[in-house]
UniProtKB/Swiss-Prot annotation:
It is found in: Cytoplasm. Keywords: Acetylation, Cytoplasm, Metal-binding, NAD, Oxidoreductase, Zinc. The record marks 114 as: Important for FDH activity and activation by fatty acids. GO terms for cellular component: cytosol. Class-III ADH is remarkably ineffective in oxidizing ethanol, but it readily catalyzes the oxidation of long-chain primary alcohols and the oxidation of S-(hydroxymethyl) glutathione. Also acts as a S-nitroso-glutathione reductase by catalyzing the NADH-dependent reduction of S-nitrosoglutathione, thereby regulating protein S-nitrosylation. NCBIfam families: adh_III_F_hyde. The modification N-acetylalanine is found at residue 1. Pfam families: ADH_N, ADH_zinc_N. Belongs to the zinc-containing alcohol dehydrogenase family. Class-III subfamily. Zn(2+) 2 binds at residues 96, 99, 102, 110. One of its GO terms (molecular function) is S-nitrosoglutathione reductase (NADH) activity. InterPro entries: ADH-like_C (IPR013149), ADH-like_N (IPR013154), ADH_3 (IPR014183), ADH_Zn_CS (IPR002328), GroES-like_sf (IPR011032), NAD(P)-bd_dom_sf (IPR036291). This is Alcohol dehydrogenase class-3.
Length: 373
């Protein structure tokens, strides 16, 4: 591997402050690490959640970002699966292929580097980023808000070199998460009725997954009616706003669907909505999947009777996809027009306008903003 690289990055110096575009130093990759030139990255609510200071695992200063795509610049010692020039997507859930999680077909939650990743450092306990003489932390094992980043070789997957990186970067998180929540976690069946709470990027991806699975009714639920048209483009058969009803939304859905939905999905991260989503499920077989990440310290509640009478409450991370093996297949599905990705991108901005991308997201004006270096 070559030496230190100086490049642009968006540094989060402290919680609650805008990101700052800085020149940083990126050290060469150590053993089993890869240095990647990021070509495009998108902004996700998880980045904003950590930046806000609400994330108990959040530490500063840090380089955020976990939806990106790029090209391998150099590889560290012992790296066999990548070479300079490979087209890649960094993965916030790795796949080592060896831990008991990777060996179990029921989960995608590889734990090999979980502890160090949570602390914002590489597996050897140190960072590859410095700025103005200070160490800057990594984020989710990816740190895509930098022109160059260093990732563990298990946190990376090689994809079709002809894929447009300013689109497929979304497969690093939101689109894959929602799509897999429907296909892998819920395992939606043909002819079923689904309810999707929250019509942001992840909610739209859930709708897309439900449609691919053959659901006959897909009900979108959001307070913001501006989101309804897009939801219908993705496959929602009807959309409702809780603000239009006096009674709780779960009661409305139970009436609309003759007893409740077969599958519901919470794509917001609000524990009150999680309860409504469960209680909107049909007695005897309804399944509710939690996709949204709730704030620290929040707890879910319902009456045990809801579960005793045959409803199931589940959660999902990254759509249940085993990352290294699945993301290249998702890219191929997109390339063969089997799944939508372009339609999620509402704004494309130069990297320097990253704070504007956060503002668009907070204002509900964007689904996904993609930043290009």
């Amino acid at each position: 591997a070559s030496g230190v690289i100086k490049c642009k990055a968006a540094v989060a110096w402290e919680a609650g402050k805008p990101l700052s575009i800085e020149e940083i130093e990126v050290a060469p990759p150590k053993a089993h690490e890869v240095r990647v030139k990021i070509i495009a990255t998108a902004v996700c609510h998880t980045d904003a959640y950590t930046l806000s200071g609400a994330d108990p695992e959040g530490s500063f200063p840090v380089i955020l970002g976990h939806e990106g795509a790029g090209i391998v610049e150099s590889v560290g010692e012992g790296v066999t699966k990548f070479k300079p020039g490979d087209t890649v997507i960094p993965l916030y859930i790795p796949q080592c292929g060896e831990c008991k999680f990777c060996l179990n077909p029921k989960t995608n939650l590889c734990q090999k580097i979980r502890v160090t990743q949570g602390k914002g450092v590489m597996p050897d306990g140190t960072s590859r980023f410095t700025c103005k003489g200070k160490q800057v932390l990594h984020f989710m094992g990816t740190s895509t808000f930098s022109e160059y980043t260093v990732v563990a070789d298990i946190s990376l997957t090689k994809i079709n070199a002809s894929a447009p990186l300013d689109k497929v970067c979304l497969l690093g998180c939101g689109v894959s998460t929602g799509y897999g929540a429907a296909l892998n976690t819920a395992k939606v069946e043909p002819g079923s009725t689904c309810a999707v709470f929250g019509l942001g990027g992840v909610g739209l991806a859930v709708i897309m997954g439900c449609k691919v699975a053959g659901a006959s009714r897909i009900i979108g639920i959001d307070l913001n009616k501006d989101k309804f048209a897009k939801a219908k483009e993705f496959g929602a058969t009807e959309c409702i706003s809780p603000a239009d009803f006096k009674k709780p939304i779960q009661e409305v859905l139970i009436e609309m669907t003759d007893g409740g939905v077969d599958y519901s999905f919470e794509c917001i991260g609000n524990v009150g909505v999680m309860r409504a989503a469960l209680e909107a499920c049909h007695k005897g077989w309804g399944v509710s999947v939690i996709v949204g990440v709730a704030a620290a310290g929040q707890e879910i509640a319902t009456r045990p009777f809801q579960l005793v009478t045959g409803r199931t409450w589940k959660g999902t991370a990254f759509g249940g996809w085993k990352s290294v093996e699945s993301v290249p297949k998702l890219v191929d599905e997109y390339m063969s027009k089997k799944m939508k990705v372009d339609e999620f991108v509402t704004h494309t901005l130069p990297f320097e306008q990253i704070n504007e991308a956060f503002e668009l997201m907070h204002a509900g004006k964007s689904i996904r903003s993609v930043l290009k270096f």
